[in-house]
């Protein structure tokens, strides 16, 4: 990159692809737990479903605070070496993340309390290593580019990478696991393959992405976990985005956790999950590709809200008419196409709130903003893991037998009605309370640049007087 106006400077395609590879890697490791770990607990380890829900709640709540710890570490960095401010965390945390992602799917013959303890500890350790790796990855966008359109494109590439990782996991994990006559061995081997793949993609991201604008933390600014919370509540656009994301991520993860049960017990075809994943994730990829163009034409907020409408419509159609394989896949494609815009813009909007925070406080703290934001995401993920486990117990789910009509109806409500309701809440929150539009953002960036130019001129004048 040459030294031009950072607001108009464009990134090369290679760097955008490399950044997207980071979320391919992250999601290859994360999605195996999001999609299949609860089922592994209930069907292979013999845990009651509510045990699995409690494990998700405890571990995800713990990792919400490890996200804060990551922000503290990022914002505390003073002596930044040639690897950059964020990239070293990607490099060094990817190894334990991949290792623990595999260990979570190792079946043991211990008693139920011991199994539960081990599962909880492993999930918490995975969350810690994943926080160090993924929060740093997400917080890196403002250091890569200051161009708002390029940020939207990076977010689209990130969401595209996440979708590819999720697609591979949805389509390939169960077929790989089914290759082994012993299902417990199948889970372990499939998890190992996905973890190795995830690690490789994280290394490709590390090698291909550069931090072009590294802002060191001011000397008088001391990072703290408390400041991560303050970064949220003193930044209204960030707070609104956090609340909306709390709803959207919970809705999305509930759908992912329940779809394996829905295809097996409601539609009586667990292999349909691979086909559904192929088509619906394909629709997400199409949506992701359309994000930069639609944002340029209509603006981020309008595209976000349109995605929420599509999501809700798809779920409503599926609840009433998705009783066979064809209509289930078709209406799921509509819903997932809508999520492409929502999930992409969840990340594209965060860098804008970083700049808003700098404009308002004079302190640029990407780590605090991003980890405050991911704190809400982890709370959302905790609820998304906890609620299915509890609700599976409430609706009378028993593994590996034909389910009652009441249980089947409960599964339909879990996968369609709950996510739809959360999507509507998120849409109302963003529609009425998010006020950081493109025009206002441009004025904020202009004022920040004027401040910095004034500070530089003052420093140069002081230096010349001293000499």
Predicted regions and their residues:
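Membrane-embedded alpha-helical bundles of multi-pass transporters/translocases
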Residues: 2-467
């Amino acid at each position: 990159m040459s030294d031009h106006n950072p607001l108009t400077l464009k990134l090369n395609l290679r760097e955008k692809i490399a950044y997207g590879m980071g979320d391919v890697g992250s999601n290859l490791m994360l999605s195996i737990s999001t999609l299949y770990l609860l089922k592994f607990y209930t069907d292979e380890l013999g845990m009651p479903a509510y045990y699995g829900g409690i494990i998700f709640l405890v571990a995800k709540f713990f990792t919400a605070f490890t996200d804060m710890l990551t922000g503290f570490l990022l914002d505390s960095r003073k002596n930044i070496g040639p690897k950059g401010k964020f990239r070293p965390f990607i490099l060094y945390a990817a190894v334990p993340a991949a290792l623990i992602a595999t260990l979570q799917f190792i079946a043991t013959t211990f008693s139920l309390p011991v199994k539960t303890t081990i599962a909880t500890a492993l999930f918490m350790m995975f969350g810690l290593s994943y926080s160090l790796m993924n929060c740093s990855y997400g917080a890196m966008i403002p250091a890569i580019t200051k161009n708002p359109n390029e940020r939207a494109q990076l977010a689209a590439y990130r969401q595209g990478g996440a979708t590819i990782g999720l697609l591979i996991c949805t389509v390939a994990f169960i077929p790989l696991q089914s290759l082994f006559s012993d299902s417990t061995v199948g889970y372990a081997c499939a998890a190992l393959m996905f973890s190795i793949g995830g690690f490789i993609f994280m290394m490709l991201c590390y090698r291909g992405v550069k931090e072009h604008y590294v802002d060191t933390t001011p000397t008088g600014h001391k990072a703290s976990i408390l400041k991560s919370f303050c970064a949220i509540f003193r930044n209204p656009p960030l707070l609104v985005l956090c609340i909306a994301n709390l709803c959207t991520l919970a809705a999305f993860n509930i759908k992912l956790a329940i779809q394996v049960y829905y295809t097996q017990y409601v539609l009586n075809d667990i292999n349909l999950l691979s086909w559904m994943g192929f088509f619906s994730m394909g629709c997400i990829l199409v949506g992701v590709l359309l994000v930069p163009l639609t944002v340029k034409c209509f603006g981020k907020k309008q595209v976000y809200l349109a995605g929420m409408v599509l999501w809700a419509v798809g779920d409503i159609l599926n609840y009433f008419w998705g009783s066979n394989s064809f209509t289930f896949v078709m209406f799921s494609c509509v819903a997932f196409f809508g999520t492409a815009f929502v999930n992409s813009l969840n990340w594209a909007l965060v860098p804008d709130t970083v700049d808003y925070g700098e404009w308002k406080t004079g302190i640029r703290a990407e780590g605090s903003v991003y980890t405050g934001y991911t704190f809400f995401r982890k709370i959302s993920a905790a609820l998304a893991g906890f609620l299915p486990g509890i609700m599976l117990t409430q609706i009378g789910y028993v593994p590996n037998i034909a389910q009652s009509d009441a249980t089947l109806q409960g599964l339909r409500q879990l996968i369609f009605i709950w996510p739809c309701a959360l999507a509507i809440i998120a849409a109302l929150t963003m529609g009425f309370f998010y006020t950081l539009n493109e025009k206002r953002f441009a004025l904020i960036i202009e004022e920040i640049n004027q401040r910095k130019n004034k500070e530089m001129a003052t420093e140069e004048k002081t230096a010349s007087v001293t000499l």
